[in-house]
């Protein structure tokens, strides 16, 4: 064994050994419990960032630990390879998206391998290959035939200069990110998946996910948004047979309706605008706004009257219809009743446009109702009683809703209804780099699914990206085709699927990526029954990706592709962000030049707090910004490859796992990286020093050990239990590492020169190599092979605590006098309460601080302390 720790050589040798032996290859084995550990697959953007490294290190630690625990482990990897960034990169670099993507995959794969992750690379796939996306095209046609995929008009952001549809994030201050043109809202035909048919199941099954963070479950519940309310109609004043429908969760306030607002796209708005140029212009202005809910929530609320009136279903009074820019056509009926007195948004709108405000709820003990200023109690439904509501006066919320719903039902104008905030999933994207939608448009036969024998519809890869619309729509060789039904000339669909489609089932494909004849097979039942055992990814995916994946497993179950596997992810760990300090200089025009922390010298005070910073190249000051998530935009990232090249993968892994619990933010620290490297060098040197005296058999009992050595062995076996619990149940890797560091400190302090001590040293170092192997597998592999020639740490069992080693002849108890720590005593581990009390009262320190006073009471906390009250 060489005396110096050389990570590059050690890690190269370990990785070659794992490749040669197929250490990470997973094969179904009914004799073992399975453990499917999956970290969310990456988008191949070019290089790994520290967020990737943290995510995949967590997964690797859990995978390696469970393999050592006797599980049959699967840890796969693939590439979420479709998406807009590839088109943007193609535009900037003048290369086709496919070439850019495949090149990035090759580089990032090598980076992942250099980190020593135990990934079964035989299962690797990229979602942009026809071998993968052919199956989602196949599934699309099945769902289309069953009505679970359908076509309807959808609202999109339209760039009138580039003649293309923009994603919400491509609209900046109402303008196209590339052209700068004012964006319009347009309705175009799009394909939707009927996720609303599964809303109730998606909601109720959240209660069967105890292994998920409560925050994520709550976010999904809110997104699905189950509301119990009343759907009712306002008959049109000039044509009572025509009705305007609305849904409300506050039917108790129906007597306070003073106007109704409809979306700009609502048929009533269109009808009213036909002879009203001013209203038509306002509707067009509304259509130029964003289509995202977040945009609508924050923008200024505007409206205009339509001149149309409807009849209140209970009072018979005329109610004016307005167009409101805050009403979504895609939610409910595209219309809302407005009760300004008891809804803050309606109140502000009514004040702005001088509309009536009618109070219909009062709360005892509150201030008087004011038509000029909003008060929180106006919206209180728990304590309120109806007023100014005719026969409903005096009723509370529930009684009022029941009575009002019954009266509406009697008039055939409404009833109670459960409604969901969740909307059907629009999967059409007017972009190039995605999975082609397998539909052919025929003038005679309509929309025809592509037959199985013509799948996959292959996406052309050698294209030129201009940024103005999808190239597919300009490629007759792609879209010109024959109708599969009648054989006549037809046109292929040029929209592609939302990239969430690919990531909604990829975890199932890992079970059988080599199957060329079916989307999935029976191996899915082995690996995925009861859910993926551990799923790891950022909380930013809490809603869409995780919700769509849950939806897909239910869809695929119902079309007979898979059995009832239950929820797809049994346990979810949402890792925290990797953050680092930021530095910048102010430029002309208020812009900031962000400077990488590696290029800055920081001055700190005696407490280590930064007081100033200068740029290394010119020595001039830079501004210290906040600590923020590592990002390209703030230039505060650390290149994982540079870290690996300087310190090795094990140091990177050790620091990342030690710096914070996995679900908390990790603050980058160069000093912390240095500390991790020093620890590994120390561990190497400690093992080297032990082996210089020759190999010995590891101790298996306390026979022949001194008292101090027995204490060390006890600590060793206590550490085994703690680390196993930290890895498995608690998933607190930082405390596991801290426990091993404490153990090594105790090892260094113990005299281990005699024969029994040498055997204990052997047992300790073998165990430490295995305890740390899931986190630092390269050095763990190398040290264990030196300590146990011919043995392979990757095939070793995780160290298990020996109950006999944990037994103590004597225990130490702290002694307090009047609640203050004053000393310590050692007593037999079997000592009874009377013996412990007597020993404590005889302790010199206790006697001194009792100051001659008698003991009024002696409190014994077993195994911990004795408190004497004097």
From Swiss-Prot:
Keywords: Aminoacyl-tRNA synthetase, ATP-binding, Cytoplasm, Ligase, Nucleotide-binding, Protein biosynthesis. Its main location: cytoplasm. It holds the Pfam family tRNA-synt_1g. Gene3D superfamilies: 2.20.28.290, 3.10.20.590, HUPs (3.40.50.620), Isoleucyl-tRNA Synthetase, Domain 1 (1.10.730.10), Valyl/Leucyl/Isoleucyl-tRNA synthetase, editing domain (3.90.740.10). GO terms for cellular component: cytosol. A motif ('HIGH' region) lies at residues 42-52. It is an enzyme of class 6 (ligase). It is found in: Cytoplasm. GO terms for molecular function: aminoacyl-tRNA deacylase activity; ATP binding; leucine-tRNA ligase activity. Transmembrane segments: none annotated. GO terms for biological process: leucyl-tRNA aminoacylation. It catalyses: tRNA(Leu) + L-leucine + ATP = L-leucyl-tRNA(Leu) + AMP + diphosphate. ATP binds at residue 632. InterPro entries: aa-tRNA-synth_I_CS, aa-tRNA-synth_Ia, Leu-tRNA-ligase, Leu_tRNA-synth_edit, M/V/L/I-tRNA-synth_anticd-bd, Methionyl/Leucyl_tRNA_Synth, Rossmann-like_a/b/a_fold, tRNAsynth_Ia_anticodon-bd. Its EC number is 6.1.1.4. A motif ('KMSKS' region) lies at residues 629-633. Belongs to the class-I aminoacyl-tRNA synthetase family. This is Leucine--tRNA ligase. It comes from Dechloromonas aromatica (strain RCB).
């Amino acid at each position: 064994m060489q005396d110096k720790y050389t990570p590059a050589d050690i890690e190269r040798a370990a990785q070659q050994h794992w490749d040669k032996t197929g250490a990470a290859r997973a094969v179904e084995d009914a004799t073992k419990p399975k453990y499917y550990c999956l970290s969310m697959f990456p988008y191949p953007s070019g290089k790994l960032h520290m967020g990737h490294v943290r995510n995949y290190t967590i997964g690797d630690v859990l995978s390696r630990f469970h393999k050592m625990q006797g599980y049959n482990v699967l840890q796969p990897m693939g590439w979420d390879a479709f998406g807009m960034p590839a088109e943007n990169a193609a535009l900037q670099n003048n290369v086709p998206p496919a070439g850019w993507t495949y090149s990035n995959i090759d580089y990032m794969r090598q980076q992942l391998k250099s980190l020593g992750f135990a990934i079964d690379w035989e299962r690797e796939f990229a979602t942009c290959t026809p071998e993968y996306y052919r199956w989602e095209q196949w599934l699309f046609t099945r769902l289309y035939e069953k009505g679970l995929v359908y076509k309807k008009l959808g609202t999109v952001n339209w760039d009138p200069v580039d003649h293309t549809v923009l994603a919400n994030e491509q609209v900046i201050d109402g303008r196209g990110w590339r052209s700068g043109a004012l964006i319009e809202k347009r309705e175009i035909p799009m394909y939707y998946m009927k996720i609303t048919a599964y809303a109730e199941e998606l909601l109720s099954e959240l209660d069967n996910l105890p292994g998920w963070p409560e925050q994520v479950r709550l976010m999904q519940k809110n997104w699905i948004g189950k509301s119990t309310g009343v759907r009712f109609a306002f008959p049109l004043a000039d044509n009572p047979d025509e009705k305007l429908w609305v849904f409300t969760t506050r039917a108790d306030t129906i007597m306070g309706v003073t106007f109704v607002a409809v979306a700009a796209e609502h048929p009533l708005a269109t009808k009213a605008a036909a002879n009203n140029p001013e209203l038509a212009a306002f509707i067009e202005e509304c259509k130029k706004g964003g289509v995202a809910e977040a945009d609508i929530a924050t923008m200024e609320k505007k409206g205009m009257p339509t001149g149309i009136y409807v009849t209140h279903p209970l009072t018979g009074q005329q109610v004016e219809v307005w167009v409101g820019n805050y009403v979504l056509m895609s939610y409910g009926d595209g219309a809302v009743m407005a009760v300004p007195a008891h809804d803050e948004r309606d109140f502000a709108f009514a004040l702005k446009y001088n509309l009536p405000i009618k109070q219909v709820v009062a709360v005892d003990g509150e201030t008087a109702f004011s038509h000029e200023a909003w008060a929180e109690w106006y919206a209180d439904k728990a304590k309120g009683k109806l007023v100014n509501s005719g026969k409903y006066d005096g009723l509370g919320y529930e009684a009022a809703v029941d009575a009002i719903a019954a009266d509406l039902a009697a008039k055939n104008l409404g009833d109670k209804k459960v409604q969901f905030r969740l909307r059907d999933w629009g999967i059409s994207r007017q972009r190039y780099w995605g999975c082609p939608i397998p539909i052919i448009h025929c003038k005679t036969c309509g929309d025809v699914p592509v037959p199985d024998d013509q799948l996959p519809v292959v996406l052309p890869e050698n294209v030129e990206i201009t940024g103005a619309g999808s190239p597919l729509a300009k490629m007759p060789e792609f879209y010109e085709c024959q109708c599969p039904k009648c054989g006549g000339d037809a046109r292929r669909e040029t929209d592609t699927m939302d990239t969430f489609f690919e990531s909604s089932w990829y975890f199932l494909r890992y079970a059988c990526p080599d199957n060329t004849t079916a989307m999935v097979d029976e191996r899915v039942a082995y690996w995925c029954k009861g859910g993926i055992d551990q799923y790891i990814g950022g909380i930013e995916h809490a809603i869409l990706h995780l919700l769509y994946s849950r939806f897909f497993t239910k869809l695929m179950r119902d079309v007979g592709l898979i059995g009832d596997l239950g929820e797809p992810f049994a346990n979810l760990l949402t890792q925290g962000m990797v953050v680092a300090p930021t530095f910048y200089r102010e430029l002309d025009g208020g812009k900031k030049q962000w400077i990488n922390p590696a290029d800055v010298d920081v001055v700190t005070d005696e407490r280590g707090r930064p007081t100033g910073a200068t740029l290394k190249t010119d020595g001039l000051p830079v501004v210290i910004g906040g600590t923020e998530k590592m990002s390209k935009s703030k230039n505060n990232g650390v290149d994982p490859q540079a870290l690996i090249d300087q310190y090795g993968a094990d140091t990177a892994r050790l620091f990342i796992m030690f710096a914070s619990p996995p679900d908390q933010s990790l603050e980058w620290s160069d000093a912390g990286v240095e500390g991790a490297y020093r620890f590994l060098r120390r561990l190497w040197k400690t093992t080297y020093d032990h082996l210089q005296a020759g190999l010995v058999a590891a101790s298996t009992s306390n026979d022949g050990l001194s008292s101090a050595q027995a204490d060390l062995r006890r600590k060793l076996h206590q550490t085994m239990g703690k680390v196993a619990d930290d890895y498995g149940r608690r998933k607190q890797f930082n405390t596991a590492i801290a426990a091993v560091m404490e153990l090594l400190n105790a090892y260094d302090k113990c005299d281990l020169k005699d024969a029994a001590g040498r055997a204990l040293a052997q047992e300790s170092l073998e165990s430490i190599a295995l305890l740390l192997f899931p986190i630092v597998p390269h050095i763990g592999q190398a040290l264990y092979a030196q300590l146990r020639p011919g043995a392979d740490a990757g095939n070793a069992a995780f160290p298990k605590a020996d109950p006999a080693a944990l037994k103590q002849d004597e225990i130490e108890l702290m002694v307090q006098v009047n609640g203050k720590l004053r000393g310590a005593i050692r007593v037999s581990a079997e000592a009874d309460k009377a013996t412990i009390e007597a020993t404590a009262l005889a302790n010199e320190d206790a006697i001194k601080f009792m100051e001659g006073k008698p003991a009024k009471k002696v409190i014994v906390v077993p195994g911990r302390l004795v408190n004497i009250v004097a």
